[in-house]
């Protein structure tokens, strides 16, 4: 019979030890034994709470931006998948909350940003929230590392080459390799995007497809035949002082 006092003591000791480890180390610890796996599998445990409160900006924890990720562990994961301050146009900066990009009001420029982590395997979904005016062109989608992040003029930068795929929210057009690939979604009088709406981007690296959801409604597959390359969440914007947030959600739920 397990002594409940000893079990509680062991739990508290593990909690303290795991709180001082790096996140990569925690991943390795979860593979040591069933006991440690079950301990770390509690995504709202004090261990994940401690790491969440110490690594995430307080501003993001106080806002409703992370409403779609309910546990401490998923909030941490979203933070490490957010926009990269090192992989964006010089006219873009990432706000202190870590999840929102701000495009500076630079004339005759189109500017883009990529997420910190790209995907080549599995199925992934993330939310994009355009929190400022769209301007004449506002594109969300994916790109490889080779896709450009800045160009002259006000254009649909994302989707302008063979390294990027995008949905222009202003005109409801799909874009790739500099060509319009058709209207999207395929609905009669499809409603235009409203600022503040959450769009879910669904990347399936097994079926090589990209799809979108809005207001929990699946809008259909937008792109097929995606290459076997690492693909990154990406947006491109033209409007000065507009802001776009991105929250990684993990594996999409079917149904």
From Swiss-Prot:
A GO cellular component annotation in the UniProt record: synapse
Changes seen on gene knockout: Dramatic overgrowth of synaptic termini, with a large increase in the number of synaptic boutons and branches. Also impaired synaptic transmission.
Coiled coil: none
Compartments (UniProt record): Cytoplasm; Nucleus; Synapse; Cell projection, Axon
Pathway it works in: Protein modification; protein ubiquitination
Matches recorded under CDD domains: F-box_FBXO45, SPRY_Fbox
Residue ranges of every copy of the B30.2/SPRY domain listed in the record: 61-253
BP GO annotations: negative regulation of gene expression; negative regulation of synaptic assembly at neuromuscular junction; neuromuscular synaptic transmission; positive regulation of protein catabolic process; proteasome-mediated ubiquitin-dependent protein catabolic process; protein ubiquitination; SCF-dependent proteasomal ubiquitin-dependent protein catabolic process; synapse assembly involved in innervation
Record Gene3D superfamilies: 1.20.1280.50, 2.60.120.920
Keyword field: Cell projection, Cytoplasm, Developmental protein, Neurogenesis, Nucleus, Synapse, Ubl conjugation pathway
InterPro entries on file: B30.2/SPRY, B30.2/SPRY_sf, ConA-like_dom_sf, F-box-like_dom_sf, F-box_dom, FBXO45-Fsn/SPSB_families, SPRY_dom, SPRY_FBXO45
Tissue: Expressed in nurse cells and oocytes (at protein level). Expressed in the brain. Expressed in the neuromuscular junction (NMJ).
Domain (F-box) ranges: 3-51
Pfam families: F-box-like, SPRY
Family: Belongs to the FBXO45/Fsn family.
Subunit structure: Component of an E3 ubiquitin ligase complex composed of hiw and Fsn. Interacts with Rae1, probably as part of the hiw-Fsn complex. Interacts (via B30.2/SPRY domain) with vas. Interacts with Cul1.
Protein's UniProt name: F-box/SPRY domain-containing protein 1
Gene name linked to the record: Fsn
């Amino acid at each position: 019979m397990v002594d409940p006092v000893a079990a509680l003591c062991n739990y508290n000791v593990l909690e303290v030890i795991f709180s001082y480890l790096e996140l990569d180390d925690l991943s390795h610890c979860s593979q040591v034994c069933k006991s440690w796996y079950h301990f770390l599998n509690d995504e709202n445990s004090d261990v994940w709470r401690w790491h969440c409160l110490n690594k995430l900006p307080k501003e993001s924890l106080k806002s409703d931006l992370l409403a779609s990720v309910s546990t401490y562990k998923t909030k941490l994961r979203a933070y490490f998948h957010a926009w990269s301050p090192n992989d964006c146009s010089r006219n873009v900066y990432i706000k202190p909350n870590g999840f929102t990009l701000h495009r500076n009001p630079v004339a005759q420029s189109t500017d883009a940003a990529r997420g910190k982590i790209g995907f080549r395997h599995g199925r992934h979904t993330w939310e994009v929230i355009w929190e400022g005016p769209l301007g004449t062109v506002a594109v969300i989608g994916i790109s490889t590392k080779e896709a450009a992040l800045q160009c002259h003029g006000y254009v649909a930068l994302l989707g302008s080459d063979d390294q990027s795929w995008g949905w222009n929210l202003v005109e409801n057009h799909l874009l790739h390799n500099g060509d319009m690939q058709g209207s999207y979604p395929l609905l009669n009088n499809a409603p235009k995007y409203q600022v503040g709406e959450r769009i879910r981007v669904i990347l399936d690296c097994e079926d090589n497809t990209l799809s979108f959801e809005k207001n929990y409604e699946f809008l259909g597959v937008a792109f097929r035949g995606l290459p076997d390359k690492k693909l990154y969440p990406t947006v491109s914007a033209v409007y000065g002082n507009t802001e776009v947030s991105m929250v990684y959600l993990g594996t999409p739920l079917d149904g």
